[in-house]
Amino acid sequence: MSSSTPFDPYALSEHDEERPQNVQSKSRTAELQAEIDDTVGIMRDNINKVAERGERLTSIEDKADNLAVSAQGFKRGANRVRKAMWYKDLKMKMCLALVIIILLVVIIVPIAVHFSR
């Protein structure tokens, strides 16, 4: 090697061509490096996916909290409506009972007065 070129441990030298084991070793090293690079890429993708999933989980938690608050409001409103309808139904039953009593009085009183003479 000349002194003008920097030392490269992966570059083939004149002596390496004579030894096929060294070439096989370097190709195996290159294969391993490619596998490592692929693994690193996959791990980075997985880390990004975990981060996205964490953001989505936070969003889902916020939506669940909002839903719980809405459910409580709905329950209170439903109870108010139920009580209002019960009171309205009670008033209707009382009016119906009053009408029946008035009709009975209108029918029975003249008959009673007529037979009492």
Curated annotation (Swiss-Prot):
Its main location: membrane. Residues 28-88 form the v-SNARE coiled-coil homology domain. Residues 1-30 are annotated as: Disordered. The chain crosses the membrane at residues 95-111. One of its GO terms (cellular component) is SNARE complex. The keyword Transmembrane helix applies. GO terms for biological process: ascospore-type prospore assembly; endocytosis; exocytosis; Golgi to endosome transport; Golgi to plasma membrane transport; Golgi vesicle fusion to target membrane; intracellular protein transport; retrograde transport, endosome to Golgi. It is a single-pass type IV membrane protein. Residues 112-117 are vesicular. It is found in: Endomembrane system. Palmitoylated by SWF1. PROSITE patterns: SYNAPTOBREVIN, V_SNARE. Keywords: Coiled coil, Isopeptide bond, Lipoprotein, Membrane, Palmitate, Transmembrane, Transmembrane helix, Ubl conjugation. Residues 1-94 are cytoplasmic. One of its GO terms (molecular function) is syntaxin binding. This is Synaptobrevin homolog 1. The gene is SNC1.
